Each structure stands twice: as C-alpha cells, then as structure tokens.
Amino acid sequence: MAYGILLLLLGGLLLANICMGSVTIPLEGIFRFIKGEALSQVETNILFQIRLPRALSAAILGGALGLSGYLLQTFFHNPIAGPFVLGISSGAKLTVALVMVFLLGQAVKVSSAALILSAFFGAFLSMGFVLLMAKAVDKMSMLIVSGVMIGYICSAITDFVVTFAEDSDIVNLHGWSQGSFSGMSWSNVQVAAIVVGIAA
C-alpha cells in the first residue's frame, strides 16, 4: 500500500515537472499526446529536449541517493548514518574544490568526468579515514563521531582552499555543491541509468 502511494506521488511529481515551467504544457495535452495526437513543435522540443530528460534524471538519481542512504544505514547498523553525517559529502567537495581551484585556475580544461572521478576519490578517501578511526577505538558507536570530525576537517580545508580561488571558481564550486538538473540530455539519462543499474 505504501509503495503504491509513493509511486502515485512520484508519477504526480513527474507530470507536474513536465507540465509546469516558463511555457506551460496543459495536462490534457500530455494525455492527448499519449493517445497519439501531436503536440506543437515548440511543445515537442520542450518536452523531449528539456523536461523529460531532466525529470527522468531527477527520478533515477534521487532514487539512487535514497538507496545509498539505506545501504549505509544497513551496513553500519546505525539509523542516522548517511553521506553527510559520515563526512563522505565533505570529502567529495574537498577534492572537487582542489581540482577546480588549482586546475581551472591554471587554465587547464577539466571535464565533467574528471570532476566526478575526483568527487568519488574524495568520498572514498574520507570514508576510509572514518573506518580507520572507528576501527582504532573498536566501537561502531564512534563511527558517527569520526564521520562528523572528518566532515568538519574537510569543510575547513575546503574553506581555506576557496580563499585562493577566483570568483568564477567559487561560483562554479557553489553551483556544483548545490547540484542542478538543468541541461540534462538523453545521453546523461542513459549514463545515469546504466551506472545506477550496475551499482544497484
């Protein structure tokens, strides 16, 4: 029953995301399109080039984020374990900040894949430190404390690194840390679906 309600909510949110925007696509127009009737060229472009890729990316990656949190809580037997509490997110942001400030600052071209790999490396490294600290005291209850400590250390180093950054790099880092689904394409949806499918 609960899963059915969640699926209905997800479907409703997807429809709202598709219909609402600077150009409104009426809900009846979506249903007519499903039945085989054609939309206008503008509505078709907005639907298939902008809103559908964005909505599907949000659904796939949002589900992956929820699943990762559930797996962390299950693995560590702690209901409050998560990427923010364990310092994983802070470690990822630190390495991305280093790449943006010191590589982009030197006019080195950095691809999205490089930022993703650097974030993964930082998350993996910070999680390793947390596990080592928790193992040293031999108490899983110290895992959360260790994660919070690592998170604050990474955040402090990130703030220090940002002081050397150009204004444009600070804006880029802030935009990356906040996250956005604008500009998502069908190729991004395919990559996200493949990666999440393999990881799951």
Place the predicted regions along the sequence by residue.
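Alpha-helical transmembrane segments in inner-membrane proteins
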Residues: 1-200
